[in-house]
Amino acid sequence: MGDLTKSRSRQCPETLGGESKVLLFNRVDDPFTVSATTNEATALNAAVTAVYSYDLSGDGNTLEESMVGDIVTGTRVNSQTAVLTLKKMTVADSAEFNLLASSCAHAVVLTRNGDYIALGITEGCNWTIVSSTGAAKADFNGYTVTGVAQENKLAPYLDSATVTALLAVVV
């Protein structure tokens, strides 16, 4: 059983919602070294050799985590859900998203506050791809990509050295 250790003071309204980028990479065992005390990713596994970067814009890119502890079973499950909107449908993207949907790729989202947050670090994410042409001329044309993972802790934030290592292998 976990005992609380800290209070939290009132926070100033200085943050922004949403994500500005998602980094995807093929599943590997233990992609990050994560501190047990701070839940911060402090190192990148050397097996991560290629990371694919997708820029996000506009509202509608979200990351939500919902952790549920069950006192009866003694378990806790954190559902991580990233919903990403990528404008404009293309042949190349269609082929790549077919691969993504059949993968267990890991994801790191970059928030509008400059934080990098890792998703699906134990088993990767399950991916759903929805392509939409829209109906009216001003409707969204592109992909809604949803990644879902279940972990036993909240998603770890990456420290600066780990961010540097991750960005060094973006192709």
What role is predicted for each listed range?
Residues 123-171:
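Mixed-charge, glycine-accented linear interaction segment located at domain edges/termini
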Residues 1-2:
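N-terminal export/ancillary region detector
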Residues 6-81, 124-137:
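Solvent-exposed edge beta-strands and adjacent loop segments
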Residues 20-27, 82-84, 103-112:
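Short, hydrophobic/proline-enriched secondary-structure or compact coil segments at domain edges
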Residues 74, 98-100, 109, 135-139:
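A general structural signal for short secondary-structure junctions and capping/turn motifs
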Residues 95-119:
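Short, acidic/charged, Gly/Pro-enriched secondary-structure junctions
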Residues 91-100, 156-158:
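Short, conserved charged micro-motifs
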Residues 71-92, 139-153:
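Oligomerization/assembly interface segments of phage tail-like spikes and tubes
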